[in-house]
């Protein structure tokens, strides 16, 4: 059977050259304008930008403006940064403008390439978002490329974690904005929780360029962005369960490392029932009794925490806080927590403060966030291996851009050992061999724990080195920039794969130019930077990123991977008969082997993992699309009301729907059930606005009279508000109430869907498709949400009474009475900010109702 991944890869190779040939014709046009643009004065460039904007407004499109725009950016870069865009960068710029992915090797100048498409698309004056992998790069790239944009007459800015809303809004209103994917996503969610358009910071989603697009859309696709609030505190339960779980033995559970799952055996279930019954936690002496569902969930999470999640690999504990480590990048994911109670289970395991669970207020995945943009493009050094996923999920085509200079890096065949100990010994010997000559070495490991193991082995050999991992990443950029120095030895996790070029001889400016050049030539003669991979990662793309640190822009360099059969990849996904194959090939203890059979086995193992992860992401997206469609409806309705000048029309429409529904129930109320439903809903709606006698009379009215009665009650309450406030303020009250009703009901709805997702998989045991079942249930819940939202909104409006604030004459005596009281908050907390709900000892009232009301 044809492997679809292989087919796609072959298709890309055959079609890629055709695409490059087509784009090269555009590059020729750009080059033909270079001489004329060179004759422009500095003052002419902003004028040219204005001319291009005018042409766009007069009917020309961006494609026709591209050659002149790119020529202007190239010349502006030469004058401001002394950097001229190479033809391959012009190629990449065209690919980005066309909404595709440009695969460009490390060191080929992706940041400069992005400036071309960013400038062209900024001419629309609708904003361009450039996505970077961290805050440091957002600020750096904005400032460096900002020199070009400013010269051309464009505005630019960046978004960082410590900015307030005013600063964020200002930066989003610039022509070009640099930000991380998480900042963009969270700002979108927060904007859809605001109460006025003026409070929102983003202005739309038109065009985005994602730097290191594979990291954002592939690696982080499974991680949703979540804004959460405090939920019920179950701290003691987590601690109690953790204590009891430690009493289980290995025969009480089975571990599935492939799917990262753990299941209790029959013996384990019996043991759990005894342990938890003795502790008084289990109900009805049956672990799987419906009343113990919460307990089952917490036990499973505690088991996963103890046996599937490893400190130093999946997380670290720093300053008493448990922090997640990204499995692919090796970075700490600041501010993120494992969901579904797993984070609390890990905190209990590590005996640190267990923080309360959070309830989701709003969430979105990166997959669905980036689908908000009219056009998306990106660049990376490693996209071809994931081309099928990019096309299938995002409809993005990958175009492989040739290097400016020929790639001369040597990628040696993998060295395979039987045991990890033999492999480690060989790695240290290789480091010693290269280090004696002064050749710079970059050693890649899969986790913090592994990096510390190799550090200890090098310390034993008295080799000076630097360890770079999530524990000590503060000087990452500086360390990596100088990784090309003589005698440099750096041990790192995948953290050092992005954003910073390694220059042979050292970072420019770190030493005199002549000394730098001399050192560079020495290192070239030694073979350049030597990259050592201590094992194959689960993704070929991550391996390629490691290789890509060497051999930038035609420099010398080399790479090699050392592999053992005890490595996680081979142990979990490799063939069980691999050891027998090595024995047949005559591999002796301590020896390595390089053989096509082994390389094929490694490739198959990685493809298994890649295919499995792709399926997981595809499946998650199918489920998330259900929530995404509902999110779109809710956010659209919310924004519609928030931005509307005719909020009364929304209220009247909802009232009309509710009355029609009640009349429908009224005509069916022959049955006791329908009668109760009608009475309950009508009582809820009218609340305290009618007494029992009037309520009875309303239920007996004919349909038209019934409708008029409810309408009159609603309008009576509204007119009272208008009389006391004025019409504009009354509209603002209705608008604010509606937005709060949406937020409250949406929050509950998300929680219901999360709970549904956790259990829907069980439907497969009844020969039902979990996805189909989830869609049905989610649709039913969404219908209920919309109905409840309207009922809550109209009910509040009918029953809402505006209370007149105390007049000036009533307030003054209070001030006089308390102004000299030493317990008065205004005196006790002079010049300090006082909470509106803080109790004032002078009056016994909340601050907002006494001194704070003055």
Swiss-Prot record:
Give the matching SUPFAM superfamilies: Helical scaffold and wing domains of SecA, P-loop containing nucleoside triphosphate hydrolases, Pre-protein crosslinking domain of SecA
Q: What is its main location?
A: membrane
Q: Per its UniProt record, what Pfam families does this chain match?
A: P-loop_SecA, SecA_DEAD, SecA_PP_bind, SecA_SW
Using the record for this protein, list the coiled-coil segments as residue ranges, or answer none. none
**Enzyme Commission number(s) from the entry:** 7.4.2.8
Positions with a binding annotation for ATP: 89, 107-111, 501
User: Which EC class is this protein assigned?
Assistant: translocase
Catalysed reaction(s) here are: ATP + H2O + cellular proteinSide 1 = ADP + phosphate + cellular proteinSide 2
Please report the record's description of how this protein sits within the membrane. Peripheral membrane protein
Name the job this protein performs: Part of the Sec protein translocase complex. Interacts with the SecYEG preprotein conducting channel. Has a central role in coupling the hydrolysis of ATP to the transfer of proteins into and across the cell membrane, serving both as a receptor for the preprotein-SecB complex and as an ATP-driven molecular motor driving the stepwise translocation of polypeptide chains across the membrane.
Q: Which family does it belong to?
A: Belongs to the SecA family.
Q: What is this protein called?
A: Protein translocase subunit SecA
Q: Which organism is it from?
A: Pelagibacter ubique (strain HTCC1062)
- Name of the gene: secA
């Amino acid at each position: 059977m044809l492997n679809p991944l292989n087919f796609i890869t072959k298709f890309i190779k055959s079609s890629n050259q055709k695409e490059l040939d087509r784009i090269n014709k555009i590059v020729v046009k750009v080059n033909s304008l270079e001489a004329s643009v060179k004759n422009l004065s500095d003052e002419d460039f902003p004028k040219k930008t204005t001319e291009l904007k005018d042409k766009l407004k007069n009917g020309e499109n961006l494609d026709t403006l591209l050659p002149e725009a790119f020529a202007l950016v190239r010349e502006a870069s030469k004058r401001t940064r002394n950097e001229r865009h190479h033809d391959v960068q012009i190629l990449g710029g065209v690919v980005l403008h066309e909404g595709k992915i440009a695969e460009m090797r490390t060191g080929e100048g992706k940041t400069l390439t992005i400036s071309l498409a960013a400038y062209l698309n900024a001419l629309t004056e609708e904003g361009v978002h450039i996505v970077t992998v961290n805050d440091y790069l957002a600020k750096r790239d904005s400032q460096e490329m900002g020199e070009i944009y400013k010269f051309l007459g464009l505005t630019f800015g960046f978004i960082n974690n410590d900015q307030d809303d005013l600063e964020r809004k200002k930066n989003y209103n610039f022509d070009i904005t640099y930000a991380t994917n998480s900042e963009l996503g969270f700002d979108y969610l927060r904007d859809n929780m605001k109460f006025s358009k003026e409070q929102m910071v983003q202005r739309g989603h038109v065009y985005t360029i994602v730097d290191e697009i594979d990291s954002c859309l592939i690696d982080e696709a499974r991680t949703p962005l979540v804004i959460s609030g405090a939920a019920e505190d179950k701290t003691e339960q987590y601690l109690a369960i953790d204590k009891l779980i430690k009493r289980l033995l290995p025969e009480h559970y089975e571990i599935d490392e492939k799917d990262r799952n753990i299941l209790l055996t029959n013996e384990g279930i019996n043991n759990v029932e005894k342990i938890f019954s003795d502790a008084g936690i289990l109900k009805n002496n049956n672990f799987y009794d419906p009343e113990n569902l919460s307990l089952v969930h917490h036990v499973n999470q505690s088991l996963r925490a103890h046996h599937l999640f490893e400190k130093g690999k999946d997380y670290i504990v720093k300053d008493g806080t448990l922090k997640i480590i990204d499995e692919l990048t090796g970075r700490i994911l600041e501010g993120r927590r494992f969901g579904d109670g797993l984070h609390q289970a890990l905190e209990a395991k590590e005996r640190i403060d267990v923080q309360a669970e959070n309830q989701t207020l709003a969430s979105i995945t990166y997959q669905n966030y980036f689908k908000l943009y009219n056009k998306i493009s990106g660049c990376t050094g490693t996209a071809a291996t994931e081309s099928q996923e990019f096309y299938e999920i995002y409809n993005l085509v990958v175009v492989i851009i040739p290097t400016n200079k020929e790639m001369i890096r040597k990628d040696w065949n993998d060295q395979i050992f039987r045991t990890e100990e033999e492999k480690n010994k060989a790695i240290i010997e290789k480091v010693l061999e290269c280090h004696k000559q002064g050749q710079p070495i970059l050693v890649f490991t899969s986790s913090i724990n592994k990096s510390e193991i190799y550090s200890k082995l090098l310390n034993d050999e008295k080799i000076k080195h630097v360890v770079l991992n999530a524990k000590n990443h503060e000087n990452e950029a500086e360390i990596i920039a100088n990784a090309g120095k003589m005698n440099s030895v750096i041990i790192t996790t995948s953290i050092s794969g992005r954003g910073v070029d390694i220059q042979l001889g050292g970072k420019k400016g770190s030493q005199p130019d002549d000394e730098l050049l001399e050192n560079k030539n020495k290192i070239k003669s030694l073979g350049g930077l030597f990259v050592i991979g201590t094992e194959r990662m689960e993704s070929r793309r991550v391996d390629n990123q490691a290789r890509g640190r060497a051999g930038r822009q035609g420099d010398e360099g080399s790479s090699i991977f050392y592999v053992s059969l005890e490595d996680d990849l081979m142990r979990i996904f490799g063939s069980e008969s691999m050891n027998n194959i090595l024995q047949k090939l005559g591999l002796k203890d301590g020896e390595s082997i390089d053989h096509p059979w082994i390389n094929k086995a490694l490739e198959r193992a990685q493809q298994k993992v890649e295919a499995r992860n792709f399926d997981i992401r595809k499946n998650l997206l199918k489920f998330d699309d259900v929530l995404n469609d509902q999110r779109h409806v809710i956010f659209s309705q919310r924004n519609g009301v928030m931005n509307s000048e005719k909020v009364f029309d929304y209220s009247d429409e909802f009232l009309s729907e509710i009355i029609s529904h009640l009349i429908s129930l009224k005509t069916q109320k022959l049955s006791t059930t329908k009668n109760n439903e009608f009475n309950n809903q009508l009582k809820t709606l009218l609340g305290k606005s009618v007494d029992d006698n009037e309520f009875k009379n309303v239920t007996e009215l004919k349909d038209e009279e019934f409708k008029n009665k409810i309408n009159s009650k609603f309008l009576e309450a509204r007119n009272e508000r208008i009389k006391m406030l004025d019409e504009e303020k009354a509209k603002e009250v209705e608008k604010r109430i509606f937005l709060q009703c949406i937020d409250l009901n949406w929050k509950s709805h998300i929680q219901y869907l999360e709970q549904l997702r956790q259990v829907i998989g069980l439907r497969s045991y009844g020969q039902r498709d979990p996805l189909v079942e989830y869609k049905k249930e989610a649709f039913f819940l969404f219908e209920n949400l919309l109905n409840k939202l309207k009922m809550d909104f109209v009910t509040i409006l009918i029953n809402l009474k505006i209370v007149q604030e105390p007049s000036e004459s009533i307030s003054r005596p209070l001030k006089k009475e308390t102004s000299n009281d030493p317990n008065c908050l205004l005196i006790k907390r002079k010049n300090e900010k006082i909470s509106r709900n803080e109790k004032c000892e002078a009056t016994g009232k909340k601050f907002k109702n006494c001194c704070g009301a003055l």
